Amino acid sequence: MDNKLIWLLPAIGLVVALQPSYIHPDEHFQTLEMLMIKFYGISGTVPWEFEPTNNARSYFPLYAFYGPLFYLMRDILKVQNPLNILRIIRFYNFMLYLSVLYYALPKLVNENKLQNKGRVNEALVFILSSYITWCYQCHSFSNSLETILLLLVLSNYTDILSNKAGLLQLVSTGFLISVGTFTRISFPAFLLLPSIQVFLKVLYRKWIQMVVIAVSMTLSTSIIVYFDTFMYESDEIIIAPLKNVVYNLNVDNLAKHGLHPRYTHLLVNIPLILGPGLLMIRNTKNDFLNLPLLSIISSLFFLSALRHQELRFLLPVVPLFSTLLTRFRYRPYLFRIWLVFNAAMCIIMGIFHQGGVIPMISNINAEQDLTIDIWWKTYSPPTWLYNNDILTVSTTSIVNNIENLDLVQFNVKTNHVVDLKGCDFDLVLEAIQNFRINGVKSLRLIVPNSMTSNVAALNQTYLVTKENSVFPHLDLDHLDSGIQNIIGLSEYKVSL
């Protein structure tokens, strides 16, 4: 059964990966938005992390992972359609993850002293049947890159501990640790306890290996810092992770993104990630010092200390937990429940969730008539998908906990995207009125079907015509509007 599933599950995963679902804004704005601005010269949304005054994100991981692919798409394949670019990126992410899994997982499973192919295959089946693999890992999250880098470092650690590591692996270990840290500041949290184990076991046996890794880390970090300083065109040295750490240590900053109880990772996110898979984990008392388990403990301990805790921050734990499973044949009923759980989550997160946003932008592009697009009660529209080099992007601002329209450029009447996020309906009315005052005759309003009653109220003042509707689109943020209304995304023409 395992061998058949190992071939079948990647095929299913690839189909899901190519769906236009939209899980979180960061999958676009922290990666693809900046890459499209740099490589294709579009006008888009620069997230706060990449603003020159903040420089809290490193460009190096983006260019290292995606740079060659973007050169290929732009200069050789001549890919211009944003939807095709998105599909290529997701295909690339999925195949890269599979390649790293097939390389690293056997080492991590065997690190648990389980020297047989059946264990490796079952660990692969567990990962490949997880909705996290299908829905999150193929999307362009920095967390997805973090997972890949972590697997590579831990696989190198197993070789170091078993005296199989050569010079190339030692040098690459230092490089990968440096890149991982500049990819996400959470990366060291996954590595701290495993690194301590490696350090203590190797220090007196082959201390020169630690020196090689340290030198490699130092040189790699210097190169990355120089690259980021160049990209930000700064006169001062830019150390992006340091800026990010300082930002995240300020609770007031975290409050802008949402504060969570410190038990959220352990009691909410882990069950959401693993579901019934938690019941498939064997007794690990004899494996306390194995690298995957140490990495899990290390990450949960340190990441739970922070007040902002999102599910995607724990993406790397899926392949780590796969090394701690009991054999499927001992609990076949649990494995079936696991498959049902992941199929359901896949449909919700991999197909339906905010699934109308990307097709809607694609439809608007096909009309080749962009005046003013107002998005309301959806995730922020990935403006890179407009593929527009003269685009103006406006959004709301918050002053003294009051949301306002001070940053919206009402004098811009064409090629203008306005993201009103989840503001009150009164602010939507104010925005439309301000555009009317500035001489705008009509505009687009894109809203989920859960806002139908508000559209009806708007129709009492303006002529509102439904132009288009996209399905599937699941709006989980407004469940109070009724199950029948949370499906679908609609485009309206508002004549002023």
Curated annotation (Swiss-Prot):
Task: List the subcellular locations.
Answer: Endoplasmic reticulum membrane
Q: Report which superkingdom the organism of origin falls in.
A: Eukaryota
Q: Which UniProt keywords apply?
A: Endoplasmic reticulum, Glycoprotein, Glycosyltransferase, GPI-anchor biosynthesis, Membrane, Transferase, Transmembrane, Transmembrane helix
Q: What is its EC number?
A: 2.4.1.-
Which InterPro entries is this protein grouped with? GPI_mannosylTrfase
Q: Key word Ligase present in the record?
A: no
Pathway it acts in?
A: Glycolipid biosynthesis; glycosylphosphatidylinositol-anchor biosynthesis
Disulphides = none
**Which GO terms label this protein's molecular function in UniProt?**
alpha-1,2-mannosyltransferase activity
Q: Which residues cross the membrane?
A: 5-25, 56-73, 85-105, 174-194, 207-227, 261-281, 286-306, 311-328, 337-357
Q: Which residues are glycosylated?
A: N156, N459
Protein's job: Alpha-1,2-mannosyltransferase involved in glycosylphosphatidylinositol-anchor biosynthesis. Transfers a fourth mannose to trimannosyl-GPIs during GPI precursor assembly. The presence of a fourth mannose in GPI is essential in fungi.
Q: Record's family?
A: Belongs to the glycosyltransferase 22 family. PIGZ subfamily.
Q: What is this protein called?
A: GPI mannosyltransferase 4
In the UniProt record, the gene name given for this protein reads: SMP3
